[in-house]
């Protein structure tokens, strides 16, 4: 069975890992980095992903960042003169990760385990699956990020029982999961979180502070200047990272804008104390989900054995201190917060292929599921933190006499009223025989699969008529749209491969021209005029082809030059070899001559005493 890669598709950074033997290994990207910025930019018809896209974000308005925050919504982003769904942009990131994983493995990759925040709802999970499909990946499993982290942490600890709290603060989302580990079983007891809290929010606090201070000093609002705003974002992210290691950092942005008197520069120092003050409310928001998860799991703090920190934002000192204060425990630092999720996803891939034995993952649904009933009430069928996969049925009836149909409004959330929860979908069960209210028996069944994706059916127990719906992400992507996006993604991959081939050919041409010119110079006056002239002629032809930019012509002329240059190099080698042989012959003769002038050799005799 081919390898199943593990992908952590993050808000700010993504990572890909693979199982090698029993070890989960992070695959470095083409720039040698173990994580890849989740950034996509468009330039001259080319799609650029990762580090290169992030570097040009300041100057290129066609750059998309933090697309994960829009997953599961119908919101689109404009770039490159087109509108893209969040799934399409995410697919470009996935395709890039898939591409360099294939380069590393030396084989095609068709399957992946992709992680999502534990608190992602059904629409967001479905959108992630769609993104994988567009990227040409069969998504074998959607795994919650804290669960994947626990899997990576606990793989070598299957011989002991422990309860762990995973505190996962990423670029755009926050999750807390409590798991029980023992005998190879990873059992999620409870999960809680906030899909609108992450490192981006900490950056935004710094940006708002810088904008406000600059406006006070110069009367100019930098938030209205798109390019200045991108520079501020980069500076804020850097300052945040700096303040994890030092107590004060300098923010210096020359020529940030221009005033009536000329160019203006932003120079400001930011202390850790000020940063902590700016972000105090964000840190406070992490405490409620911790308490909620503990309460749902029915555990006290004293029963938690380890606290695992996941996500780059857990490096913020104030966050670490808040975790210590809230749990009364020193966080376990045995895992890399940026890499552990992808590594856990790769381990789950190994479980699916059978390469990892005796490991069972029992995950939960993060939010309650149910339907709208009379009076706009939300009636739960499946409570949050129920182990998945699961199925649950309940019988309802009509609200009016002779009601011919019932509308099934499927919801996800925790609020008592339907209007306050997330709509997953609606469908109708029709042709209900005329009867007084309360008589027809309508059985509603919810199914949640191992990926946390929901399907619902309604059945009239009197007529056995049934209606079924698989909840689609409310981005509204049909199978046809996904297929079209897949074809577009494949076409882009082919175009990218062709562009790479062009660049490689041009580099080869440059190299061949340089090497041949060097050889021609070195062979001047050495008597290889025929070969030198042939090489020079082929070199001139290649230079003409290079100027024309005709790739086929360049390829043909490069082959011709390589042939002539090789013939010249052979002559040069033969001459060097002959000279070396002659020199060795002369040394041998001289050595023999000096030996003949020495004393004659005489056999000696000796007598034992």
Curated annotation (Swiss-Prot):
Q: What induces it?
A: By stress conditions e.g. heat shock.
A GO MF term: unfolded protein binding
| Region feature (Disordered) | 578-609
- Entry superkingdom: Bacteria
Q: Which InterPro entries match?
A: ATPase_NBD, Chaperone_DnaK, Heat_shock_70_CS, HSP70_C_sf, HSP70_peptide-bd_sf, Hsp_70_fam
Q: Which Pfam families match?
A: HSP70
List all Low complexity biased stretches.
Answer: 578-595
CDD domains annotated for this entry? ASKHA_NBD_HSP70_DnaK-like
Where does the record place the modification Phosphothreonine?
173
Mark out the compositionally biased spans (Basic and acidic residues): 596-609
Q: Keyword set for this entry?
A: ATP-binding, Chaperone, Nucleotide-binding, Phosphoprotein, Stress response
- HAMAP family per the record? DnaK (MF_00332)
> Can you tell me which family this protein belongs to?
Belongs to the heat shock protein 70 family.
Q: What does this protein do?
A: Acts as a chaperone.
Record PANTHER family? HEAT SHOCK PROTEIN 70KDA (PTHR19375)
Name this protein carries in UniProt: Chaperone protein DnaK
Instruction: Please report the organism this UniProt entry assigns to the protein.
Output: Streptococcus agalactiae serotype V (strain ATCC BAA-611 / 2603 V/R)
């Amino acid at each position: 069975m081919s390898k199943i890669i593990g992908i952590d598709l993050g808000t700010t950074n993504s990572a890909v890992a693979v199982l090698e033997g029993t070890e989960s290994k992070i695959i470095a990207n083409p720039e040698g980095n173990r994580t890849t910025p989740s950034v996509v930019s468009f330039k001259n018809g080319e799609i650029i992903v990762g580090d290169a896209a992030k570097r040009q974000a300041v100057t290129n308005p066609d750059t998309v960042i933090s697309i994960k925050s829009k997953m599961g919504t119908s919101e689109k982003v404009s770039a490159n003169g087109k509108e893209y769904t969040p799934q399409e942009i995410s697919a470009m990131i996935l395709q890039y990760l898939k591409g360099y994983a294939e380069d590393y493995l030396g084989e095609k990759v068709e399957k992946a385990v992709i992680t999502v925040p534990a608190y992602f709802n059904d629409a967001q999970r479905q959108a992630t699956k769609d993104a994988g499909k567009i990227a040409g990946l069969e998504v074998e499993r959607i795994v919650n990020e804290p669960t994947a982290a626990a899997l990576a942490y606990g793989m070598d600890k299957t011989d002991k029982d422990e309860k762990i709290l995973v505190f996962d603060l990423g670029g755009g989302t926050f999750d807390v999961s409590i798991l029980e580990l023992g005998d190879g079983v990873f059992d999620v007891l409870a999960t809680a979180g906030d899909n609108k809290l992450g490192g981006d929010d900490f950056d935004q606090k710094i940006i708002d502070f810088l904008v406000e201070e600059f406006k006070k000093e110069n009367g100019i609002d930098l938030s209205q200047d798109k390019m200045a705003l991108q520079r501020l974002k980069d500076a804020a992210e850097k300052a945040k990272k700096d303040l994890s290691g030092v107590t004060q950092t300098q923010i210096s942005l020359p020529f940030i804008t221009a005033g009536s008197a000329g160019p203006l520069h932003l120079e400001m120092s930011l202390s850790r104390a000020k940063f902590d003050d700016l972000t105090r409310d964000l840190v406070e928001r992490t405490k409620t989900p911790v308490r909620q998860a503990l309460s749902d799991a029915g555990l006290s703090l004293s029963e938690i054995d380890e606290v695992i920190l996941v996500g780059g934002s857990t490096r913020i000192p104030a966050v670490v201190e808040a975790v210590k204060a809230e749990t009364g425990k020193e966080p376990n630092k045995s895992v890399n917060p940026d890499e552990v999720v992808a590594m856990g996803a790769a381990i789950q891939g190994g479980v699916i292929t059978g390469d990892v034995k005796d490991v069972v993952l029992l995950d939960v649904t993060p939010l309650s599921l149910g339907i709208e009933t009379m009076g706009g009430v939300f009636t739960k069928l499946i409570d949050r933190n129920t182990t998945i996969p699961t199925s649950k049925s309940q019988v309802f009836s009509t609200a009016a006499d002779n009601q011919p149909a019932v509308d099934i409004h499927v919801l996800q959330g925790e609020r008592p009223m339907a209007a306050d929860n997330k709509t997953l979908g609606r469908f109708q069960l029709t042709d209900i025989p005329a009867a007084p209210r309360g008589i027809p028996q309508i059985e509603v069944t919810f199914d949640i699969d191992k990926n946390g994706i929901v399907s619902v059916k309604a059945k009239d127990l009197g007529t056995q008529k049934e209606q079924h719906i698989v909840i689609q992400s409310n981005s509204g992507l049909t199978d046809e749209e996904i297929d079209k996006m897949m074809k577009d993604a494949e076409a882009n991959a082919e175009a990218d491969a062709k562009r790479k081939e062009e660049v490689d050919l041009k580099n080869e041409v440059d190299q061949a021209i340089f090497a041949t010119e060097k050889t021609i110079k070195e062979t001047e006056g050495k008597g290889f005029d025929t070969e030198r002239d042939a090489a020079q002629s082929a070199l001139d032809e290649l230079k003409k082809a290079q100027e024309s930019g005709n790739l086929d012509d360049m390829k043909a002329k490069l082959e011709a030059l390589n042939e002539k240059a090789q013939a010249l190099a052979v002559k040069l080698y033969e001459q060097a070899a002959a000279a070396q042989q002659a020199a060795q012959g002369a040394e041998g003769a001289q050595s023999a001559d000096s030996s003949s002038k020495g004393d004659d050799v005489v056999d000696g005799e000796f007598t034992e005493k």
